[in-house]
Amino acid sequence: MTTPAPSPVASEQHSAGGLVVRGDEVLLIATAGGRRWQLPKGHLEEGELPAQAAVREVREETGVTGTIVAALSGVDYTFLERGKHRIKKHVDYFLLAYESGSETDFEPREVVTARWFSRPEAIARLSHANDRRVAEQAWRIVRERQGESTAPGGNR
């Protein structure tokens, strides 16, 4: 018996996520049994703006609350859901400064753990090229702002 080909028609999804900075550290989440490190993100709820969804998803997936510092580049990609349905996904990302909370207080639906990493280690651990690109953009913004004050989420 042959496996049916994926549908050529793609449904569309819109998500939002965030890169949280605390001093010189970045917060990542592990999924897929801890084998994949990525930025927290999730679907927009009805009537929710991307920035609101990013803050909510970061809080739900990491236990950490952050304040939006800047919008980052969006990411577009296509994937197969359950090997059958083609999904076109757009994710709006935001740079967030750490505000409060603990990375041990999250909802463990899809997330295995949340952990702080140094910038170089975070970039190296991120499993997806799109996430690495977003993280590099975020750090360029952090460096630019460090000339004005301290890093987002740092001690002032």
What role is predicted for each listed range?
Residues 2-39:
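N-terminal strand-loop-strand
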Residues 2-9, 79-82, 156:
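Class I (Rossmann-like) S-adenosyl-L-methionine-dependent methyltransferase catalytic domain
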Residues 3-4, 63, 151:
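N-terminal compositionally biased, intrinsically disordered segments and leader/signal-like regions
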Residues 8, 41, 79, 134-136, ...:
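Residue-level signature of transmembrane alpha-helix interfaces in integral membrane proteins
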Residues 40, 46, 151-155:
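Functional cleft and adjacent loop/helix regions within the main domain
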Residues 44-133:
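Unchanged
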Residues 124-156:
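Charged phosphate-binding loop/patch that engages nucleotide di/tri-phosphates or the phosphate backbone
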